[in-house]
Amino acid sequence: MSVDELPSSLRPASLSDWDAGRSMGRLIVAWQHPTLRLISPVGVLEHGPTGYRFRYLRRARELAGFQPFLDFPAWHGDYRDERLFPLFAQRIMSPRRPDFRHFLDQLDLSPDASPWEQLARSGGRSEGDTLQVFPAPVVEADGSTACMFLVSGIRYCNGGVLPHLAVGDRLELRDEPGNSANPEALHVCVAGQPIGWIPDLMIDYVRTSRRSGPVLLTVVHVNGSDAPAHLRVLVRLEGTVPPGYQPMAGPGWETFVID
């Protein structure tokens, strides 16, 4: 089964209520090589009316250096649970922590945000870890599309120092063909000044949107320098894609287990 063949109960309802993980849907689970730092998709985490489901992508078995997660030892496993799996639940901050509300503010989430929302918005990253998740962008029937994501690699641009940014500011995209790690990389810029990059897993989607028409990239939320670098800038992208295109789906995104 390809991840674009999800049952309707697992598909985000619409752009208006999706908002980077507010509704049930799917997250792409990615692994970062500990030395090469390359980020690759390895699995799909789904959230539906009956609970949670995890399956590996077929491509994960061919990924140099990657081994199945201890919680999910079998490539062909079809893992299901009414509760969020511990591997992902441990990446969600406990509401008992005194800094819980501050953490939600950094993610631009409401106080009643669900664990799924936290995971989708934050990416589930932790210090020294190699796992993160990405919400799959929504595409409407007319080809319009939107998604929110955190700007990547801010610490590597201008020493992590950001220019003045305000909610609603327009941002620019700039090609970086000289990037030795990924010639397809896209800089996120303010008045021509790079502040970071589009996350690697979003590049195909963003480039497809650019080829299909105008793309609007705006600032949704900005955190101060006390926030982790990967949480500094939350942005929203709006555009269109060709008929039939589904991000993070199709060839190369098939799972081992089919329904």
Residue map of PLM features:
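Conserved active-site motif detector
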Residues: 2-259
